[in-house]
């Protein structure tokens, strides 16, 4: 494991070796037969101090009565996007929502005592294809399911191995999935496809290459920055190209993308539109965004005069309602708290917000603090938005 990057801190000490090894083991890479495990893997740290040239635009000192939020500039230039739609209760695209549910259930089955699928290893991927009605835009059925899951070496032949895993996915994983989702979404699963008896059923692909024994960090070199669509909206909306993980909140790649999701979700929940893409862009060292762009895909509501609200009008209201300076984003969502580990799997957006107690260490002193996780998923601006748009 190579831990690299630039950091700036006056008094922090982190036991990199322990953090890495504990995390790898907790994920599930804890057996020598995986050819990579937390107990025996090498850990190399190349962390070094952040460039002073970058830091000078982010960590400026006040020179009088200036607003401190105006002094802290964006940590980089770029475009960030937030998206929301009415596919699910979480205002997320259905395809990505189902993909995350499938992997969560698969991981739970793997960790069960006396697991029903005891051959499972930690690495896994999923992909769902949904057929939509061309006129209403509503989902009609699940078209294709792809599940690729790492597994132990079987002593029998490959055909038996493939058949066994496929049978378990169909009879264990998918039924467990259906228990986790609303009835309206479960109804889209219309059984497995058969050309004659069930042409409306889903096509199921399980480990399409036929074998998946070598996986995880032994099979692939890292994921950070290489799966940015899985981290966000699964291909819906848009992405500015900047990965989230591995960045502190001064980097607007992360913090502004969270803020844009918060805005899009609250506007859709308030009824401004059924689908909304929010784009913000920044210049390094400059606090306020240089632009705000909105695409409602023709789904915007009508104002009190019966006229459809324009995307330009929505963008203008966003600029009035939400403070998008990095310091204010960080303050609103508590982004300096240790809240990021859960974002490393199952996506950064579309998650359930919750509060939990964490341990903080400063100057060798340990303290407990309750912090908000996934605060950008809260729907606490809906009333404010409805009032602003007279809805």
Language model regions located:
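Internal helix-turn-beta structural module
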Residues: 273-275, 282-391
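Glycine-rich, mobile lid/loop segments that gate access to catalytic sites or pores
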Residues: 25-29, 34-214, 345, 350, ...
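Short, charge-patterned binding micro-sites
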Residues: 1-9, 284-288
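Short, conserved charged micro-motifs
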Residues: 10-16, 91, 153-165, 300-313
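ATP-dependent carboxylate activation and anion-phosphoryl transfer catalytic cores
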Residues: 148-155, 201, 208-215, 220-223, ...
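Structured core elements
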Residues: 2, 44, 80, 127-129, ...
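Conserved mixed alpha/beta catalytic, RNA-binding, or beta-rich assembly cores of soluble enzyme
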Residues: 174, 221-274
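Alpha-helix N-cap/helix-initiation motif
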Residues: 13, 91, 95, 158, ...
């Amino acid at each position: 494991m190579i831990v690299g990057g630039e950091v700036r801190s006056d008094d922090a000490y982190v036991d990199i070796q322990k953090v890495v090894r504990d995390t790898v083991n907790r994920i599930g890479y804890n057996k020598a037969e995986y050819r990579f495990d937390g107990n025996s893997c090498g850990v190399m740290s190349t962390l070094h101090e952040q460039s002073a040239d970058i830091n000078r635009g982010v960590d400026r000192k006040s020179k009088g009565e200036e607003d401190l939020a105006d002094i802290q500039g964006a940590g980089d230039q770029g475009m960030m996007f937030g998206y929301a739609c009415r596919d699910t209760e979480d205002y997320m695209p259905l395809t990505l929502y189902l993909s995350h549910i499938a992997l969560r259930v698969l991981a739970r089955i793997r960790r069960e005592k006396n697991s029903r699928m005891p051959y499972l290893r930690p690495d896994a991927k999923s992909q769902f294809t949904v057929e939509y009605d061309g006129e209403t835009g509503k989902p009609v059925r699940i078209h294709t399911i792809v599940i690729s899951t790492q597994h132990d070496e079987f002593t029998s032949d490959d055909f038996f191995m493939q058949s066994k895993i496929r049978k378990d996915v169909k009879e264990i994983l998918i039924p467990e999935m259906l228990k986790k989702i609303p009835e309206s979404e479960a109804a889209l699963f219309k059984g497995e496809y058969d050309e004659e008896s069930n042409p409306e059923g889903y096509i199921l692909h399980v480990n399409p290459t036929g074998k998946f024994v070598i996986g995880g960090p032994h099979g692939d070199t890292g994921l950070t920055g290489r799966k940015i669509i899985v981290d966000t909206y699964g291909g819906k909306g848009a992405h500015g190209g900047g990965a989230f993980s591995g960045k502190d909140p001064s980097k607007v790649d992360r913090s502004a993308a969270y803020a844009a999701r918060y805005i899009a979700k609250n506007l859709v929940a308030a009824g401004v539109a059924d689908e909304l893409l929010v784009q913000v862009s920044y210049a390094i060292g400059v606090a306020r965004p240089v632009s705000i762009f909105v695409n409602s895909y023709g789904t915007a509501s009508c104002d009190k005069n019966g006229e459809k609200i324009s995307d330009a009008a929505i963008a203008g209201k966003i600029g009035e309602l939400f403070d998008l300076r990095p310091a204010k984003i960080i303050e609103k969502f508590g982004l300096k708290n240790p809240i990021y580990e859960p974002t490393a799997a199952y996506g950064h957006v579309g998650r359930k917000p919750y509060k939990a107690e964490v341990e903080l260490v400063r100057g060798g002193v340990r303290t407990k603090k309750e912090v908000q996780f996934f605060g950008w998923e809260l729907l606490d601006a809906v009333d404010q938005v409805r009032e602003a748009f007279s809805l």
